[in-house]
A protein has these predicted regions:
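Sec-dependent bacterial lipoprotein signal peptides
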Residues: 1-19
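Short, contiguous, well-structured surface segments enriched in hydrophobic/aromatic residues
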Residues: 174-177, 188-193
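Active-site substrate-binding loop specific to GH73 endo-beta-N-acetylglucosaminidase modules
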Residues: 55, 60-63, 74-82, 116, ...
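Bacterial Sec-dependent N-terminal signal peptides
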Residues: 13, 18-41, 48, 52, ...
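Hydrophobic alpha-helical membrane-insertion signals
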Residues: 94-147
């Protein structure tokens, strides 16, 4: 066993060096009050879900549109596992299994062997188009049903959101939407860490649903929905924001961050993302007068409802659906003075008109394509895209080929199908996999399922006892890490390169990751180890170390494991001898077989080659 320990320590040290340098038993729930359908794997259920239309509240009850959609089945992990093909897999022209796995590392929450085979068989573009056409399953439906089943009211809990989130990660077939929504959640940040949102599971679930809904839509609609969502209004403090007086100015928080972090950034950019210069200095995109003007646009906005009374504005009337319906404007509290945005006064004469004009102005700013495009590249493909890569993605944002600006499908295709994304070694070092994705990778790669059917997972943002990151629990509006972060005093900084995710890769976090994943691999994750995997496919080949390592290499590293790492892992696995033919002790046989798998998975996920997504 000493060799095993030496290898494990070796991998841990390498990871620390990197940080230093650098089937489901649950039925899918539908809307509250509706029947929970019994679903068979591969089937589709259709339901009616009321969604608020783009036309906002114009007095009276919020206008709603009933949108019918086919809900994708939450494919049971055991069913996905059973669909794996054995033997030679027929692949589409120009696609390899390793290439398919690499696409999934960028475009999903994690690869399964079944998914790898499907991408390889169908081809990358057909798979992307299939993902674009796949309907969305809402977290809010799950939370509503969870409260209904428990016989309680209220606003939902964090735990209920995480149950829904991890259920969708493990079993949802809409993997591209989930990955893009996760990326958007790190640009349009709201957080459970805020005391005012910590007990608002349904509101936050609805916000995440909104990001997912817009993941394949238009960026302009996304801006509108973010600006009207109560979670953002609470988080960046413009809910119940009142017009200016002689002694009071409107809250400027959201106005500032909407420009700085969510649309145009601090400095004017060329299409390739490089800064424009004037007299050798960067050119600021906005002034404080613009912040003050935009802040006045966000006055008078508060809860949706049947009327626009003062009581409803201040929230003393608590309608049961106000936590997810879009805000409405209350003229009694809206500023009527002149509002300057990006150097020019707004011309609209109503609150709704002013907001539309302001968002149009931001949306049409030439910075948006490169500013947002670069961040989405960082969240999916590489931390250091070349200027040419950024320019190509920005061009797709500016015009999808049919004269449409802000088409997210065009942007996503431009990101994922670019040569720098598809050609190994072309993307300047890839990116560090953030902890949430490592956790999701493990769950999906080994077909993890929930014992209870609820996927009871709490937040994992404690860096010592967890993974140092949980979705929707960023410490501030600046996310878990900044897009331009480089570890100080390192070769990365000297090379003018960035590694955003290393901002949370402290020494305790590195050790916490190793300990947490070791425990997960051996025992499972979540409350009472509710989320577990049987490693069925891995145990079937456990006697052949080469086949076992080959499978892990394809699943977790897209075939990019180096010969040195491969030899380390293979030798460590080999040091645990397979049970002899005469061994009839079932406990010893199981121990030897399972520990060979556990060790192989652990060392693979501890290796720097896995931590760095190439």
């Amino acid at each position: 066993m000493s060799r095993i320990k030496r290898n494990a320590v070796s991998m841990a040290c390498l990871l620390a060096l990197l940080a230093a340098c650098g089937g489901s038993g649950s039925d899918p729930d539908v809307k509250a009050g509706g029947a929970t359908p019994t679903l068979l794997a591969g089937s589709v259920v259709t339901t009616q879900e009321p969604l608020v239309s783009a036309s906002r509240i114009a007095g009276g009850m919020a206008a709603q549109e009933a949108t019918a959609g086919a809900i994708p089945v939450l494919l049971a992990p055991s069913e996905a596992r059973s669909r794996e093909l054995s033997g030679t897999v027929p692949t589409a022209p120009g696609v390899t299994l390793a290439g398919a796995s690499r696409l999934l590392s960028q475009a999903s929450m994690g690869a399964t062997m079944y998914d790898i085979q499907q991408v390889a068989i169908k081809g990358m573009v057909p798979w992307l188009n299939e993902q674009f056409a796949m309907p969305q399953l809402m977290h809010r439906w799950y939370i509503d049903n969870a409260m209904r089943k428990a016989g309680v009211g209220g606003w939902g809990t964090q735990d209920q959101f995480y149950e829904s989130f991890w259920q969708q990660v493990c079993t949802g077939q809409d993997q591209l939407r989930q990955r893009v929504a996760f990326g958007l959640s790190q640009i349009f940040v709201v957080s459970f860490v805020d005391d005012n949102l910590g007990s608002s599971g349904r509101m936050m679930g609805g916000y995440y649903d909104m990001l997912g809904k817009n993941a394949f839509g238009n960026f302009r609609t996304l801006l509108d929905d973010v600006a009207h969502h109560p979670a953002m209004a609470i988080y960046l403090s413009f809910l119940r924001n009142k017009m200016e007086t002689e002694t009071r100015v409107p809250d400027e928080n959201f106005a500032r961050e909407l420009m700085q972090l969510m649309t145009i950034g601090l400095y004017e950019l060329n299409q390739d993302g490089t800064e424009k210069l004037k007299n050798g200095k960067p050119i600021e995109t906005y002034t404080h007068d613009d912040v003050a003007g935009l802040a006045k646009v966000f006055t008078g906005w508060s809860w949706a409802g049947h009327d626009k009374s003062n009581a409803r504005f201040f929230g003393t009337i608590e309608d049961p659906w106000r936590d997810w319906l879009p805000l409405q404007n209350y003229p009694n509290f809206h500023s009527t003075s002149t509002k300057q945005v990006l150097g020019r006064p707004l011309t609209a004469t109503t609150a709704e008109g002013e907001l539309k004009e302001a968002l149009d102005r931001l949306f049409n700013h030439p910075n948006v394509g490169p500013f947002i495009g670069r961040q989405l590249i960082q969240r999916m493909v590489t931390s250091n895209p070349s200027p040419a890569y950024v320019s190509r993605v920005a061009a797709a944002f500016n015009n999808n080929g049919s004269g449409v600006r802000g088409d997210m499908k065009a942007v996503i295709k431009a990101i994922l199908l670019d040569d720098e994304a598809r050609r190994p070694g072309a993307n300047a070092g890839g990116r560090v996999r953030e902890p949430v994705l490592r956790q999701a990778n493990w769950m999906r790669a080994f077909y993890a399922s929930s014992v209870s059917g609820k996927y009871t997972m709490w937040s994992m943002d404690d860096p010592v006892r967890g993974l140092g990151q949980s979705v929707l629990r960023a410490p501030s509006v600046f996310n878990f890490y900044r897009p331009g972060y480089a570890p100080p005093g390192t070769a990365l900084e000297s090379a003018d390169m960035v590694a955003p995710e290393l901002q949370i890769a402290s020494e305790p976090a590195v050790v916490g990751y190793l300990n947490t994943m070791k425990n997960a691999i051996y025992n499972g994750m979540g409350r009472n180890y509710d989320i577990r995997t049987g490693y069925v496919k891995e145990l079937a080949i456990v006697a052949d170390e080469d086949k076992l390592v080959d499978r892990l290499n394809l699943l977790l590293m897209a075939g990019q494991m180096t010969p040195t790492t491969r030899a380390h892992i293979r030798n460590a696995v080999r040091s645990i001898q397979m049970p002899a033919a005469w061994n009839t002790d079932p406990a010893d046989i199981s121990y030897r077989r399972t520990n060979r798998v556990y060790l192989a998975v652990y060392l693979t996920m501890a290796s720097p080659e896995y931590i760095i997504q190439q």
